[in-house]
């Protein structure tokens, strides 16, 4: 069975179809389950966005009671969209806390930042209130935006990826190795490295 699964994995990576004869040879439930998982991950990789791509537009409800439309924010500057798996879980709580407690590192930049998940809005509202988040958490319960960004995992939740979108609507950075405990500090460093301008201040 191992040799068959290796062949399947190679076929997926090459973007080719599985041969019917090989599928018929997979008799056990375990083999079929593994095949389904490989196919899911194969689709996930195909949909992944890359730097330079146009960021998929979105209109999502936020924990602040507003509908947030990407295109409207681009006229004002950059946008950072930080996807997280599930409200109230350990890593997501740490990430949200970092952003909530260190907003002073981010607010000087001419940009808007959000966390986003496929959780229901009511759940994210409670989570945002608990963490005293002073920025909107967006909800994508239909998972359509998560799919468009290529972050929907085979298990149905968003993976922890952060997208940096410039004012022209292009993705200029994707952080696929987010460290929850230093989310704010890392985001500020990335914004600086990307030359995202600071807001004008009255002297």
Model-predicted regions and their roles:
Residues 73-93:
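Short active-site neighborhood of thiol/selenol oxidoreductases, capturing the structured segment around
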């Amino acid at each position: 069975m191992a040799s068959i699964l290796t062949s399947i994995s190679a076929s997926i990576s090459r973007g080719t179809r599985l041969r019917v004869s090989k599928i018929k040879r997979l008799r056990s439930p375990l083999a079929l389950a593994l095949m389904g998982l490989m196919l899911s991950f194969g689709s996930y990789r195909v949909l992944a966005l890359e730097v330079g791509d146009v960021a998929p537009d979105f209109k999502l409800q936020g924990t602040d009671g507003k509908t947030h439309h990407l295109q409207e924010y681009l006229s004002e500057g950059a946008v950072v969209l930080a996807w997280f798996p599930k409200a109230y879980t350990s890593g997501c709580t740490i990430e949200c806390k970092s952003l909530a407690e260190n907003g002073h590192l981010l607010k000087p930049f001419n940009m808007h930042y959000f966390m986003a998940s496929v959780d229901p809005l009511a759940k994210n509202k409670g989570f945002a209130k608990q963490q005293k988040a002073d920025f909107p958490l967006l909800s994508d319960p239909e998972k359509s935006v998560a799919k468009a960004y290529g972050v929907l995992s085979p298990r149905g939740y968003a993976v922890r990826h952060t997208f940096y979108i410039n004012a022209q609507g292009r993705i200029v950075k994707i952080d696929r190795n987010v460290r929850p405990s230093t989310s704010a500090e890392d985001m500020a460093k990335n914004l600086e490295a990307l030359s995202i301008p600071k807001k004008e201040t009255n002297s």
